[in-house]
């Protein structure tokens, strides 16, 4: 009997089998047993995943729990197991007076996914608070710890999703290092009006809740994965051409000379805000989000993403890259095979 897969896109898909694991040993044994005969996929909350069709294998849900804090005069050092919900960890820290994670609040998903894509929001990235990542090579059972520097973090990437070495592995814990000498990060436009003299981690946390509530639809009503595309990084030369025609386009200069543009703004500038294709649509409040308006299939969502990709490439000579992982019947596939 196949089991229904929960995913925030609300795509109706099933897997051959779904297993929840609560310890490293259980995770390793479950993978070794299942992988002997079927494809295996690790899944958190299904919040950044697009299932194109039913999955013909076993899904393992990592639910390994644990949260431990050590501190000194300068830092909070926190060890978090990968089966903890990321937002719950942020909430616990804010409520305990531990600062540094508040800009990363209300991000769905489990902690184990945070380092893979180097999650980021409102001016802060995971790499800025990461001390280490613990993972297991599943074929050998070897447990390894990488420092933050060894993880090779970049914009929405890390060694875990950009190196062929990391194929059969599972993240089991992360380390966070948070400065006690707190400085508010208010670089993001919607946070910039907060008064620095009176701002606190709790105020930032609460403000981000209202921002996200306004911009991101509730998956209960409209299935979605938040921002579907990464904000593109382009050369300064190409950026100048765009800014000549759109002088108010939101963009941010990077240390390496490139310029980051808002994917949502680019999509909206192409006239695609609110555009519908079957049961899939570009969200009318935030063009970077693709929603399931009812009973869309995974392929309908993907076809809309492909249409957006083509229009943006035609109008701006920019190739958008999905943040969302595409899952076929036997596992993850490159999004470029579907949308480009």
Curated annotation (Swiss-Prot):
Q: Which cofactors does it use? A: FAD
The protein's location, in the record's own words, is: Cytoplasm
Superkingdom to which the source organism belongs: Bacteria
Cite the GO molecular-function annotations of the record.
Answer: FAD binding; UDP-N-acetylmuramate dehydrogenase activity
Q: Which UniProt keywords apply?
A: Cell cycle, Cell division, Cell shape, Cell wall biogenesis/degradation, Cytoplasm, FAD, Flavoprotein, NADP, Oxidoreductase, Peptidoglycan synthesis
Q: Which GO terms describe its biological process?
A: cell division; cell wall organization; peptidoglycan biosynthetic process; regulation of cell shape
Query: Where does the FAD-binding PCMH-type domain lie?
Result: 11-181
Q: Which InterPro entries match?
A: FAD-bd_PCMH (IPR016166), FAD-bd_PCMH-like_sf (IPR036318), FAD-bd_PCMH_sub1 (IPR016167), FAD-bd_PCMH_sub2 (IPR016169), MurB (IPR003170), MurB_C (IPR011601), MurB_C_sf (IPR036635), Oxid_FAD_bind_N (IPR006094)
Q: Does the keyword Oxidoreductase apply?
A: yes
One GO cellular component term noted in the UniProt record for this chain: cytosol
Named in its record, the pathway it takes part in is: Cell wall biogenesis; peptidoglycan biosynthesis
Give the catalysed reaction(s), semicolon-separated.
Answer: UDP-N-acetyl-alpha-D-muramate + NADP(+) = UDP-N-acetyl-3-O-(1-carboxyvinyl)-alpha-D-glucosamine + NADPH + H(+)
- HAMAP family, from UniProt? MurB
As for family, the record states: Belongs to the MurB family.
Please describe what this protein does.
Cell wall formation.
Indicate what this protein is called per its UniProt record.
UDP-N-acetylenolpyruvoylglucosamine reductase
Species assigned in the record = Wigglesworthia glossinidia brevipalpis
Phylogenetic placement of the source organism: Bacteria, Pseudomonadati, Pseudomonadota, Gammaproteobacteria, Enterobacterales
């Amino acid at each position: 009997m196949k089991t229904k897969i929960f995913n925030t896109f609300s795509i109706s898909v099933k897997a051959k089998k779904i297993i929840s694991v609560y310890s490293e040993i259980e995770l390793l044994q479950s993978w070794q047993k299942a992988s002997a005969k079927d494809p295996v996929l690790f899944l958190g909350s299904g919040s950044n995943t697009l299932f194109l069709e039913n999955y013909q294998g076993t899904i393992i849900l990592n639910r390994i729990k644990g949260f431990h804090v050590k501190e000194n005069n300068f830092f909070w050092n926190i060890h978090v197991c990968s089966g903890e919900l990321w937002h719950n960890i942020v909430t616990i820290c804010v409520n305990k007076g531990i600062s540094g994670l508040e800009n990363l609040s209300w991000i769905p998903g489990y902690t184990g996914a945070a380092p893979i894509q180097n999650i980021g929001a409102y001016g802060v990235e995971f790499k800025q608070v990461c001390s280490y990542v613990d993972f297991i090579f599943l074929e050998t059972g070897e447990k390894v710890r990488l420092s933050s520097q060894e993880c090779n973090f970049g914009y929405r990437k890390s060694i875990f999703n950009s190196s062929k070495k990391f194929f059969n592995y599972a993240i089991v814990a992360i380390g966070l290092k948070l400065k006690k000498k707190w400085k508010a990060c208010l670089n993001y436009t919607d946070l910039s009006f907060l008064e620095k003299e009176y701002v606190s981690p709790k105020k930032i946390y609460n403000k981000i809740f209202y921002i996200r509530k306004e911009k991101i639809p509730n998956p209960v009503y409209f299935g979605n994965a938040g921002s579907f595309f990464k904000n593109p990084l382009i050369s300064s030369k190409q950026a100048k051409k765009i800014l000549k025609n759109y002088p108010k386009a939101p963009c941010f200069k990077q240390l390496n000379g490139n310029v980051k543009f808002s994917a949502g703004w680019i999509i909206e500038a192409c006239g695609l805000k609110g555009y519908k294709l079957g049961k899939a649509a570009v969200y009318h409040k935030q063009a970077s989000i693709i929603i399931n308006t009812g009973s869309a299939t995974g392929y309908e969502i993907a076809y809309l993403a492909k249409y957006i990709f083509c229009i943006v490439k035609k109008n701006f000579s920019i190739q958008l890259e999905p943040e969302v992982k595409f899952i076929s019947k036997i596992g993850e596939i490159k999004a470029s095979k579907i949308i480009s």
